Amino acid sequence: MADEDVQALVVDNGSGMCKAGFGDDAPRAVFPSIVGRPKHPGIMVGMDQKDAYVGDEAQSKRGVLTLKYPIEHGIVTNWDDMEKIWHHTFYNELRVAPEEHPVLLTEVPLNPKANKERMTQIMFETFNVLAMYVNIQAVLSLYASGSTTGCVLDSGDGVSHTVPIYEGYALPHAINRLDLAGRDLTDNLMKVLTERGYSFTTTREREIVRDIREKLTYVALDFDQEMKTAGESSQLEKSYELPDGNVIVIGNERFRCPEVLFQPSFIGMESSGIHDCTFKTIMKCDVDIRKDLYGNIVLSGGTTMFPGIGERMTKELTALAPSTMKIKVVAPPERKYSVWIGGSILASLSTFQQMWISKAEYDESGPSIVHRKCF
């Protein structure tokens, strides 16, 4: 890795979106992590018939395809499709030859060991990368916010985690996983809008609801008070124009949708809300570092983009924590991509260059080298 001008490729594979690029300040390519296969092979006349479509192309042809997400709850469940996504990332999106670059990948906290090895194997054996490294998403988010100690709440499309990090290392015994994230909020909003008499069922309509969720929803500081206000007047109502020109009006759904993050019982889940998960994570850590964790709670991922979420987290945690504790919740404006940005920062550090797993090391030790070098 002595060559200074070889650019590292940074790939953050999320359950919903794949973010990829070089050592810049923002990802070059962001596309849906989906693979589509023709429902009825042979009838797509005139189209260059492929056996699979990836990302935006799969999205645009979804009427005639069966769409699958190879990453469920942050963990890769279908390796053939995952390989297709990586192939698409390198050759179609970034237009690079992976054998000429080192590649930095991200993984969920508590990723199964076998998965980590499989990832490493595919990178070296299928794509012949120069070198590679795997890092935990939450740790990268923390780097992007400019610190190495803190508690990260990372919530994406498929899964949420609360991860305590001390001096750059995640503390695995205290990590909490919550299978509640963006996809569930979209599902819930679809259901809630049905109560208003609007019908959203197909995958295409689901994308519309996701857009409504991203543009119009917010987290209420006081949910009951907000419900009362919404019931008494129409000041909280907003209208949204559908692609067919119809306009729908949404009122209390605007804050009922993300409230599920704090009260999962709204959708029949028995788990704790994100504030409670964060509190439990901190309480599982050594008493001496709790002050540092409370003082730097960092939000990351697309599902933390709701306006008002930072203030609400501060309020909820202040109620749970000891009264003398100073609590600071950080919600960086670029948090949608902070995992990727952290990866980009890490890959361009001169001190990081000796950390890569090289092709030679892989050939000598096999896939298990990843546990020794990436922890």
Curated annotation (Swiss-Prot):
<dbReference type="GO" id="GO:0005524">
    <property type="term" value="F:ATP binding"/>
</dbReference>
<keyword id="KW-0547">Nucleotide-binding</keyword>
<protein>
    <recommendedName>
        <fullName>Actin</fullName>
        <ecNumber>3.6.4.-</ecNumber>
    </recommendedName>
</protein>
<keyword id="KW-0067">ATP-binding</keyword>
<dbReference type="InterPro" id="IPR043129">
    <property type="entry name" value="ATPase_NBD"/>
</dbReference>
<dbReference type="Pfam" id="PF00022">
    <property type="entry name" value="Actin"/>
</dbReference>
<comment type="function">
    <text>Actins are highly conserved proteins that are involved in various types of cell motility and are ubiquitously expressed in all eukaryotic cells.</text>
</comment>
<comment type="similarity">
    <text>Belongs to the actin family.</text>
</comment>
<keyword id="KW-0378">Hydrolase</keyword>
<dbReference type="GO" id="GO:0005737">
    <property type="term" value="C:cytoplasm"/>
</dbReference>
<dbReference type="GO" id="GO:0016787">
    <property type="term" value="F:hydrolase activity"/>
</dbReference>
<keyword id="KW-0963">Cytoplasm</keyword>
<dbReference type="InterPro" id="IPR004001">
    <property type="entry name" value="Actin_CS"/>
</dbReference>
<keyword id="KW-0206">Cytoskeleton</keyword>
<dbReference type="InterPro" id="IPR004000">
    <property type="entry name" value="Actin"/>
</dbReference>
<comment type="function">
    <text>Essential component of cell cytoskeleton; plays an important role in cytoplasmic streaming, cell shape determination, cell division, organelle movement and extension growth.</text>
</comment>
<dbReference type="GO" id="GO:0005856">
    <property type="term" value="C:cytoskeleton"/>
</dbReference>
